[in-house]
């Protein structure tokens, strides 16, 4: 089909009734479907909170911080967008109320409004519009914008008003609004109730937005009669009322939406050029998801495990490592404090096939991570350390093998006599309180050179140089590198190109099958269809250990 318009189309995704309905996953799945139809798609998230970015927010409140190549600290939904579309987004993909108000106030102080009374309309909405419209580049067919929060929230009102204005300005034929709503199930009556969705759509229409499609989230199948009722009461075509019950895997969602006809309805309504969906890559992924040859357990040892979203990209990268090895990975959540003692580590890690030590901040939980690393090293359990995980491996090596029992990081003990981990020189002022903490870490994509013959270079398919995303203030203290190599046998297998910063450490394969760590956050570049090599290597080692144990038991 040939295009009838060269105008970039906008799809806005809103949510109603309750939060955490999966707006980001639904938007990402729709984006993946449109991309599979040959369209050029980009995505954006509008977040209503007043923080400039989530970089200084508590992970228990917000979940993980997703860092882009250009160093922006963004919402975890940006990670969903990158994984489902297999694209690299930049900081413009995440817009917050804090950013918008900061920019408007800065313009007012510079006198750019020429004495106008600065108001939400038009100044705030114009700034939001600018950030939406700049996504509509020449090489983009569709911009999908997720509006954070729930319809009815006071914080979301300026964003929803902006959506209404964008629809008015670019033309109704160029804008499509998808509203995601909850169908609660009332047990005693045995019914899915439509009234909350009707009220949610009514609230959206009060703002001036009529949804073009409604996605119904439920914990069970949605009867056709329910869809017809919502179509009638909410004035939406019956074919545009889409049921999206809970799926076995998040990677099933594109198939669910396609079966319900959402992508076909969107391209028809927006008059987009398209081809049939190419399922080649996605079908291979789903085969690996649902038909594994192995099943392994990987312990994730962290301090924020009460909120799994704090480690969302890590768990998805671990599972993708499983996809690379035709293995289903069960993630076992282990509170780091439970591994402080040898007995505690053995109790909580004795039944796992591999261990992952993710990043984090602050002293709490560090001794437990060190204990988990000691257990993995002594028992030859495959282990991957990320960011703080690398630093804990260095601390454990110094304490246990290099005869430096009081080795520590200046993050946890500023007066430590043996700072094997220390503050990066350019970060000293921020740590000492002379500058803002937000947005000042070593952030974004940085190169590293890998040692020949190392496990990490082998994992990266022999590449001498690689690039990964970073988010940290502390680094391995170079004054201890030689001592750790000689006494502990630790290999510094990757450094910055100038050799000043340690980026990768490992133990030789003769010492341990797979104990590897990086100062970076490789989980941020993992894709379900392109698993990251370090996570693929971890699961490969886990499968090998499991197979070897089974053979030993049979002998």
From Swiss-Prot:
Residue ranges of domain Glutamine amidotransferase type-1 in the record: 297-548
One biological process term in Gene Ontology: pyrimidine nucleobase biosynthetic process
Residue positions binding Mg(2+): 77, 146
Binding residues annotated for CTP, in chain numbering: 19, 153-155, 193-198, 229
Classification via Pfam families: CTP_synth_N, GATase
GO MF terms, alphabetically ordered: ATP binding; CTP synthase activity; glutaminase activity; identical protein binding; metal ion binding
The enzyme's E.C. designation: 6.3.4.2
Gene Ontology CC terms, in alphabetical order: cytosol
Pathway: Pyrimidine metabolism; CTP biosynthesis via de novo pathway; CTP from UDP: step 2/2
Positions bound to ATP: 20-25, 77
Catalytic activity of the protein: UTP + L-glutamine + ATP + H2O = CTP + L-glutamate + ADP + phosphate + 2 H(+); L-glutamine + H2O = L-glutamate + NH4(+); UTP + NH4(+) + ATP = CTP + ADP + phosphate + 2 H(+)
Active site: 387, 521, 523
Function noted in UniProt: Catalyzes the ATP-dependent amination of UTP to CTP with either L-glutamine or ammonia as the source of nitrogen. Regulates intracellular CTP levels through interactions with the four ribonucleotide triphosphates.
Extra remark: CTPSs have evolved a hybrid strategy for distinguishing between UTP and CTP. The overlapping regions of the product feedback inhibitory and substrate sites recognize a common feature in both compounds, the triphosphate moiety. To differentiate isosteric substrate and product pyrimidine rings, an additional pocket far from the expected kinase/ligase catalytic site, specifically recognizes the cytosine and ribose portions of the product inhibitor.
Name of the molecule in the record: CTP synthase
Protein source organism: Streptomyces griseus subsp. griseus (strain JCM 4626 / CBS 651.72 / NBRC 13350 / KCC S-0626 / ISP 5235)
Lineage: Bacteria, Bacillati, Actinomycetota, Actinomycetes, Kitasatosporales
